[in-house]
Amino acid sequence: MTPLFLFKINLMKSRFILFIPAVICFAVTFYLLTIPGNHLPKIEWVGKFQVDKLIHISMFFTLCFLFSYPVKNWIDKYNWLLYITISGILYGIAMEFVQKYFIPLRSFEINDMIADSIGCGINYWWWRRKYDQVKSA
């Protein structure tokens, strides 16, 4: 094996390692979104103030942020940021259908999809702003 080949393998491993927090976050969000409704804690004031929407926004922002971070130095980072954002939005929509049809005592809420999309959109805005600041400097 040539040293260049080994360098490429090490580079690929190091790129993969950067995605480990994102994969863990994905697994946690999947778990949280698929908990049956009767296992969710009943907190009276959460429903009153729509705190669950803030949880959705922060959860999907974090998920997209952790997938966006490793690509920040890639040449085609703008394209990857768009792919990650669209994938996050589609994941949020898909999980609402999963909750509706496959998870007992969970409901389908369009407002949850909107909150998920807002979280992904905030991540997109944050990274685009950061990329454009570096570009103009």
Residue ranges and their predicted role:
Residues 17-21, 55, 79-87, 111, ...:
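Alpha-helical transmembrane segments of integral membrane proteins
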Residues 21-33, 81-101:
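Small-polar-interrupted transmembrane alpha-helices in polytopic inner-membrane proteins
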Residues 60-74, 118-131:
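Membrane-interfacial alpha-helical segments at the cytosolic side of multi-pass membrane proteins
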